[in-house]
Amino acid sequence: MTSIDHALLEGYLVRTRWFGGKGRPFRVTGVRELAELPGDGHGPDVGVYLVTVEYQDAEDGTELYQVPLARYEEIEDRHGHAYVGSVQVDGHERHLYDAVHDRDAMALWLRGFIAAEASGRTDVGGLRFRRVSAGPALDPDLRSSPLTGEQSNSSLRFDDTAIMKLFRKVSPGVNPDIEIHDVLTGAGSEHIAELYGWIETDIDGEVLQLAMLQEFLSTAADGFELATGSVRAALVDPELTVIESGGDFGGEAARLGEALAEVHAALRERFPSERRGQEATTRLARAMAERLDRALPVVPEIEPYAARLRALYDAVAQLDGLEVQRVHGDLHLGQTLRTAHGWRIVDFEGEPGRPFAERAMLDSPWRDVAGMLRSFTYAPGLVEMSLVGRPGEDHQQELRGERAKEWSAIAREHFLHAYTAALEPAGAGSRAGGGAGADAAQNADPVAGADAPAELSPPLRTLVDAYEADKAVYEAIYEKRNRPSWVAIPLVALERIAAG
């Protein structure tokens, strides 16, 4: 077992992309070796460590991070960018590197998955490798490459066969990302990346899930990047309408709405669902109002809309109930991928920072819908903001603003039409928070344009507006603290919602 100095890890954590405590005073208070994967004699062995971080500010709190380290007897210059530090082991110096950036280290994890193919499970060095029966046989010669862009976790691909997400901030218990992907893979869902397996261990009598292996989608494009590209095309010549410019995203939005409806239907069939009474809508409205109260000191610009938002939340409290089920929980365009075979929805971890038990709670599927509607406003808002300030373009800027709103309206309406239309065959009623039936979506033509708004029943319209407002309040707090120049995007949404 390798003993690692806490100060060494503190210096390492602040250099990583995925550490959530950058900018906060913290210290490492514990390091626990969870597992040790033996090498083959030519490469490294790998130690998997659980690092306890305690914060020393007004919020306090403790977090657990997974840190797998490749351990070498000699300095490996080829991995200099992933160097963590050196330690003494039995009088000998060992050099530590972030294992995610080391192909030889990740090959040990790949071997674990291969060994589990026959029985669905194998134990290696303290880690339990699990395989899904439908997964493909894996080639031991697959080469790993870390992916860029991941923030809270680390992802790497094994050539064009599989992608592994390594959870960095971990908690004991079943991770919803693994749980939901396992169920939807078993159901044959076409709108997710198929789950191939996962890695877990036990800690203090509870399961601790560390990584998941999935289908690699070789033709995938990020949904948010696709949307912003569409917006840019629409704003190249703002004298043209969105349809005339070729920047219309309505068809893609409709297909995404259908995909989400099918995922929600599969979750409703395979997990518990129920109807809750008015106490649920009262509790929901209270939570929304409390978030608004917390937001006002941080974002005082919300104040002009606060009274109207409170009235909207009061209307939610008066709804007669809520249909709840398992949902995505943190859905936006960045959690979607467009492939040659359609849309895939990814990252079912839920809202970061919440305990697993809370993320697995039943919720209204309309929360996911509202999250996507917000994303169809964020994409044009971000692009429009990037074009502000060009001298002598006041008229052009005004036109761009109109085209951005037009793009958003088309995408939102197509998405909502398609979502509600796809739910109709399920026969769900139009009660607040439930699946939308014929009376919930009275105009559910998935190819209708922005001039034919989706006519949700009044209770559903109230609920969706409230969820969207609550999401925008959350965004306003985040942007004010992290990207102040972006706070105008959620504020515009709050102005629109407050205006009714």
Descriptions of predicted regions:
Residues 347-351:
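Activation of the activation-loop gatekeeper triad in protein kinase-fold domains
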Residues 129-142, 291-326:
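An alpha-helical support segment within catalytic cores of ATP-dependent transferases
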Residues 48, 55-288, 341-342, 353-401, ...:
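Conserved ATP-binding subdomain of kinase catalytic cores across diverse folds
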Residues 263, 276-313, 406-423, 477:
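Active-site catalytic-loop/activation-segment of kinase and kinase-like phosphoryl-transfer enzymes
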Residues 330:
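Conserved catalytic-loop position in the HRD/HxD motif
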Residues 335-345:
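Conserved protein kinase catalytic/activation segment
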Residues 390, 402-432, 438, 446, ...:
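ATP/Mg2+ or Mg2+-diphosphate-binding catalytic cores
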Residues 41-42, 122, 140, 395-400, ...:
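Intrinsically disordered, low-complexity terminal tails and inter-domain linkers enriched
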